[in-house]
């Protein structure tokens, strides 16, 4: 009888162990509960005209915490570009004036993670030209061999609003990415709820040794097997998603993907309720 009970106990333990292994433990989070400047121990800011020929000038003044939210605000502006040089190599330095400002926050050098679950609750602006994003990048290699995960992008594709969930890695050509992209027409969400854009939603990434899975309100938008995400020759055939990634939150305007900016919609607010990182613990 004792042997039977022991065998039953061992079998039950063996059955329960895989279930326990799937439990998620909160590793760190930012709930944005303190009014004022975002936590310098977690977040840094980009500055200036940065990427994708976007129209906004990034600056820290356009992001703050208030009433339990991180607020990123895009504004109209009109002032000289302090980095202006008419013959500069970088496109941003060739712009004489700053017409819009916004903010991009990132955790590079402060908080990164390898595998796990990331959840971000946010309310996004959807006016013309808005290009909000939740994304991650790797360190130690130049883009795209560092790897990029777009947990959320919103912009217009051929003038039609879309939510995007993408993964990118390096090819055999410098600065040329291989993309696994899922574009979901915004109408897919607003048909279910006409007030979708006025509400907060949860974007989630589940990332392990086998795949990256991207969700919106528990709906799977894209699943990318890591067996497919091997860099080309520039990245020495490494897999960027076997290394840590850091987080970026930004509100871009116009540029290569954002589309025509609606100047009557300003200021635009991108509001983030929380960022949470979980890992599986045995």
Description of each model-found segment:
Residues 22-282:
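GH16 jelly-roll
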Residues 1-4:
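Positively charged n-region of N-terminal signal peptides that target proteins for export
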Residues 7-17:
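Bacterial N-terminal signal peptides
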């Amino acid at each position: 009888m004792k042997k039977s009970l022991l065998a039953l106990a061992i079998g039950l333990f063996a059955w329960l162990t895989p279930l326990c292994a799937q439990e998620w433990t909160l590793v760190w989070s930012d709930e944005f509960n303190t009014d004022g400047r975002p936590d310098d121990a977690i977040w840094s800011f980009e500055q200036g005209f940065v990427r994708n020929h976007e129209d906004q000038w990034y600056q820290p003044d356009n992001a703050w915490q208030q009433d339990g939210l991180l607020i990123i605000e895009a504004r109209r502006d009109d002032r000289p570009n302090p980095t202006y040089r008419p013959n500069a190599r970088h496109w941003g330095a060739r712009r004489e004036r700053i017409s819009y400002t916004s903010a991009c926050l990132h955790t590079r050098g402060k908080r990164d993670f390898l595998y796990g679950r990331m959840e971000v609750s946010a309310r996004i602006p959807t006016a013309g030209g808005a290009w909000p994003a939740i994304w991650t990048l790797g360190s130690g290699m130049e883009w795209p061999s560092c790897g990029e995960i777009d947990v959320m992008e919103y912009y217009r594709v051929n003038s039609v609003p879309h939510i995007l969930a993408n993964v990118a890695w390096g090819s055999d050509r410098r600065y040329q990415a291989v993309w696994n992209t899922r574009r979901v027409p915004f109408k897919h969400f607003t048909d279910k709820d006409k007030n979708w854009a006025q509400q907060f939603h949860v974007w989630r990434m589940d990332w392990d040794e086998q795949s990256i899975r991207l969700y919106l309100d528990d709906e799977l938008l894209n699943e990318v097997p890591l067996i497919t995400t091997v860099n080309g020759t520039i990245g020495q055939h490494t897999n960027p998603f076997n290394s840590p990634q850091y987080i970026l939150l930004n509100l871009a305007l116009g540029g290569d993907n954002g589309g025509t900016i609606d100047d009557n919609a300003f200021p635009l607010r991108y509001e983030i309720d929380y960022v949470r990182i979980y890992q599986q613990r045995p």
